[in-house]
Swiss-Prot record:
Spans annotated as 25 X 2 AA repeats of G-[YCGS]: 3-76
Name of the protein this chain belongs to: Keratin-associated protein 6-5
GO BP terms: keratinization
InterPro entries: KAP6
Superkingdom as given in the UniProt entry: Eukaryota
Subunit structure comment from the entry: Interacts with hair keratins.
Amino acid sequence: MCGYYGNYYGGRGYGCCGCGGLGYGYGGLGCGYGSYYGCGYRGLGCGYGYGCGYGSRSLYGCGYGCGSGYGSGFGYYY
């Protein structure tokens, strides 16, 4: 599950911040593999490359157990 509704609720999904949408999702504006903000392999706030990863924290909070919860945008680790 990737949390389709996560786009509007901080991206509560697995792996990233939902699937598609304005701010979150694979290849979306704020999330996805190799996107710019928030999540993905080389995201601004999270992902495998920049500032986040497995069990890490970040400003935007995405990825596996990263930032704030398991693949969510706002919530748990903070």
